[in-house]
Swiss-Prot record:
Brain and peripheral tissues. Homodimer. Homodimerization is essential for its catalytic activity. Can form heterodimers with isoform 5 of ADAR/ADAR1. Residues 1-79, 176-220 are annotated as: Disordered. It catalyses: adenosine in double-stranded RNA + H2O + H(+) = inosine in double-stranded RNA + NH4(+). Pfam families: A_deamin (PF02137), dsrm (PF00035). InterPro entries: A_deamin (IPR002466), ADAR2_DSRM_1 (IPR044458), ADAR2_DSRM_2 (IPR044459), dsRBD_dom (IPR014720). This is Double-stranded RNA-specific editase 1. The active site is at 396 (proton donor).
Amino acid sequence: MDIEDEENMSSSSIDVKENRNLDNMPPKDSSTPGPGEGIPLSNGGGGSTSRKRPLEEGSNGHSKYRLKKRRKTPGPVLPKNALMQLNEIKPGLQYMLLSQTGPVHAPLFVMSVEVNGQVFEGSGPTKKKAKLHAAEKALRSFVQFPNASEAHLAMGRTLSVNTDFTSDQADFPDTLFNGFETPDKSEPPFYVGSNGDDSFSSSGDVSLSASPVPASLTQPPLPIPPPFPPPSGKNPVMILNELRPGLKYDFLSESGESHAKSFVMSVVVDGQFFEGSGRNKKLAKARAAQSALATVFNLHLDQTPSRQPVLSEGLQLHLPQVLADAVSRLVLGKFSDLTDNFSSPHARRKVLSGVVMTTGTDVKDAKVISVSTGTKCINGEYMSDRGLALNDCHAEIISRRSLLRFLYAQLELYLNNKEDQKKSIFQKSERGGFRLKDTVQFHLYISTSPCGDARIFSPHEPVLEGMAPDSHQLTEPADRHPNRKARGQLRTKIESGEGTIPVRSNASIQTWDGVLQGERLLTMSCSDKIARWNVVGIQGALLSIFVEPIYFSSIILGSLYHGDHLSRAMYQRISNIEDLPPLYTLNKPLLSGISNAEARQPGKAPNFSVNWTVGDTAIEVINATTGKDELGRPSRLCKHALYCRWMRVHGKVPPHLLRTKITKPTTYHESKLAAKEYQAAKARLFTAFIKAGLGAWVEKPTEQDQFSFTP
């Protein structure tokens, strides 16, 4: 018998004892001998002096009569370990023994399991424990964080019933389970009382164990009680101090103008570094503590479903919240470097955006590709018919244009020589042209929700989602109709201003002379443009002649995150789209907020926009009203500049590597029309908006694109 079998026998016998339902056992009679008091009962053999077993009531006088065992009333469902949870989520997984090392009395086993194309390894003194550790790692790849019962204990066991993504069970079954560890056996189980009030008792119907039971296996649920606040008004700093006494908080930086200061505090917990920012040091300290509680102890103080990440349908290589916080931190850090720790006059901004690239599962290897700011669009009188002015200087639009420069640079790197091909993010596609390497992903960060449909909601009504202000009684949800007719509408930005308005039915075509005579130049909202990228890709029409469609893997918001509204704006409202060309799809990226939401940026928005792409030595500052820099020079991101890059790459790519065969084009407009699959996908997108009753896409005057290449 090997070590594993011995342990299995031992653990199974212990499990039987622990699982015995003591509540169903009759109370001990005073006449019944206690342990060590009675004489051993006879086994039926002769010579025993033990007394006979008394006849039981209802035995019909037969000594060997046995009562039928009563069916035990099912007690509370015991918490499931990681192995059990993973088996329910992904049944039929095969665990492989990779190695066995160490002496006989202290062996070390390494087991592996493949889940979603990834291999996870676990080690332990027995095969069983090694399998358990492998299962935990696998679960962590798509479930947010492991459970920590000590955090719940510090909260006085007042757990919120919303400790997992229950609102998304139908759409995301993989996120049903948050816990990997069973609670401490010394802790009695606590349950919400069946009367639905806030009291706790040791019996009831709704289990608050770390591993929720799938709805299909339980009785009809009772009314959900309201979320519980931290006991005795404990704030994150107090709760963290109970879990890890004596922590030291460090003041890292102070930035911003006098009326809009931003402080950054940090704390180290269990070797992990956490930052928090806020308008004062106290708030920054609390946010640092809150971030630590969420990451280390799986203790989330804001558990409303709308604040939870909306998982992607594609390959998820990273833990959602870890990725979101890392992307935010990287973009803010790069912007700080570029603006001398926010001291530069051009550090002023309302919205900050950036694109981060990951090339594997470790977010430590992530790289900032672009950073930008801005909230305004060009004034109609400054339109350029040579592609020399930027029409839209909103931060997220500028970040994506900066990303295009990086993609051109990577294509040129691949085309240089064979040595550089390994350094490029592109590789040849078996379908013709180029495609991204498998592990390369791009993540879009925006410091607030994009203007347009994603921002049309009231972030503070009511105070708690599903609760009336100043009340502990459940009311109607905060937004009963997140998809009502007013939602999802295409919207346009206001020229030389902020905010958006719904498109008019007759405004789909704009004319050059009409705009010059005083008609407002209309630009589609950022929500609408990002929804467009989720269909046609972020590479645009020109690059699609060389590369397969590229999509964002995640969209991270620094503030004003609401999962329902953001997912509707990004892709749900066009879920009726059909007949897309090959390789084009309706992309559904990860959507997430960050642990420490950015403070609102009060005051008037600056009239400039800054941009930076990896490889640049400094930021470029553009006047958003004119679409050019202060000296009247065109931006490195303008249509003409990017068209020059495209022509240069087009001259280097062998004809057989083009995804679309194209003769030498004469104008920018003709070059874009040559990308026939891209244009077909765009047409399907516009049709989907119209069929859904959301309005017609408004395009710029065609004269803007009728320019030729001039080196």
